[in-house]
Amino acid sequence: VPEEVLKPYADGEQTPSDIPAFLSVAAGYEILHNLRASVEYHFFDDKHAGMLNDRQKTLKHGTHEYLAGIEWDIIKELTISGGFQKTNYGLSNDFQTDTSFYCSSYSLGFGARVNFNESWSIDVAYFWTNYDDYTKTTESYNNTGVKGTDVYSRTNKVFGLSLNYHF
């Protein structure tokens, strides 16, 4: 393995990964007394946050996130909700590596709350993220002189359950 590949992981090595500037704009609206909706926009200025070997400079743009959600109190004891998120990274072939890659995505989430009384409730939720495949083709795969392709892909599914006490 070439030394430059392992250098970031050497004992005592410091790897910069600055927190980017962040802009968030959100609006919520109560459509009815028991029905609420919200939209949000997030921008992460990843392109100007310091990363190892100035990796941020290979991004095409910062990260854009678009979100929307709705919440409905069906009855006093039951609330359901749903939401959507679209994340768009400014990816490039030079940014993606085998040890650190990103994929643009969209997410769907659904949830419910059951209120037992004024103090106790239970929440249940499911969240699914579908990541876009990112295909990276190189003329010299891992410096072998042979053309090669990597497909970066993943998926994420989360189930949540909580028992809540309000005091």
Model-identified regions with their sequence ranges:
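Repeated loop/turn-to-beta-strand initiation elements of outer-membrane beta-barrel proteins
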Residues: N34-V39, E77-I80, V114-I122
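Residue-level signature of outer-membrane beta-barrel architecture
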Residues: Y29-I31, W72, L78, F84, ...
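Residues that define the transmembrane beta-barrel architecture of outer-membrane proteins
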Residues: I19-L23, K60-Y66, S104-L108, T155-F159
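Transmembrane beta-barrel strands of outer-membrane/channel proteins
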Residues: V1, V39-F43, G82-K86, V124-W128
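Membrane-embedded beta-strands of outer-membrane beta-barrel proteins
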Residues: V25-A27, V39, A68, L108-F110, ...
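Outer-membrane beta-barrel "beta-signal"
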Residues: V114-F116, W120, Y126, S153-F167
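Extracellular loop and loop/strand-boundary signature of outer-membrane beta-barrel proteins
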Residues: P8-Q14, L52-K57, N93-S100, G145-V151
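Gram-negative outer-membrane beta-barrel proteins
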Residues: V1-P8, D45-N53, N88-D94, N130-K136
